[in-house]
């Protein structure tokens, strides 16, 4: 864990997919940097464990939101709730994602296809729709969305995931293009190979210890979330 530099002191941040992997690592780092966190994930127990870890490390007590991102009405209510409590939002990290089946496109059941699109793409649209007004009330609103090299569509059997990430990239670039005269910046971050549960599911024969841990890429998230970040509409690759 990097030592605190205070770059995010007092910043209010929403992180989705916060209970494990990259989301949990980013949450702990943001807390170490002084941010007040609103953590969203489906798994209550994992959120509570993260809460314990953040407070043990001296971070502010986060707000825990157990929520399935496919409950779009709940995402609408999130914006209203945050507006009432904080009156603004400084940082949005759209990290949550699911892999879906690695199988030929013609074999994918429609409901499975829809689930991957809902979580990886549509939920982020709904988050923007709900939270953009609050980001615009910040002195330096920052939105970061996690994508993947799979968005190129060059990998066989990755259809739903690839399409959902390609859609996410188009969404974020369109959103960023609308932000030119505002104080909000929106960017994409592609983590590359990282030691996560999703990576293990996608590449079961790979040695996890050969991959960098999620903590190794957290500096990039801090850079993109900080008030002094001037990047907008970019796809930033972790190297």
For the regions a language model picked out, list residue spans one by one:
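Catalytic loop of short-chain dehydrogenase/reductase
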Residues: 98, 110, 136, 141-181, ...
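Conserved glycine-rich cofactor-binding loop
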Residues: 12, 19-20
